[in-house]
Amino acid sequence: KKFNYRIISYNSMTRAIVLGGSRGIGKAIAESLKSIGMDVFAASKNDIDTSNLDSVKKFVQIHNQTDVLVLNTGGPVAKGFANITEEEWNKYHNQLFLGFCIILQNIKINDDGYIFLISSSVIKEPNSKLIISSAYRAAFSEVFKILSKDYAAKNISCINIAPGLINTDRT
């Protein structure tokens, strides 16, 4: 396969939206983007709760266009399959899957922009104690992969970052 690499140039990009931007890896990303002169909206759970679809819909009405979008959210606590409740399945379906779908349907990414998905290493190596995270992050990663071909026509890069364990208050 031949890969077409382009040099990342932030000169023409001015705006970024970072979900989960108030702590952890999201905060580090937001601070890095600010350090290169971008106007960054580092969204906290008070700004958007991706597990609450009404919150997602309100957010995209206000924040509906950007140069860089970082899809990032925390995940469920470690729990065995038999102990997961129906409410937890529904909450994390929205938080890790459907909320991101609604965001991508409603936020315009400017041509030559970037979408970063901060998923998890569980998309490649599922973890029996993180079954909800493993399932929904892998499912959305597949949607993201398919959509990346459509975004490529506008020279929008879609990058899925799948980190391992991050030292935050969740770990």
Give the positions of each predicted feature.
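Flexible cofactor-recognition loop at the NAD(P)H-binding site
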Residues: 23, 74-77, 121
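Rossmann-fold cofactor-recognition segment
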Residues: 43-54
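Catalytic loop of short-chain dehydrogenase/reductase
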Residues: 116-140, 144-153, 165-166
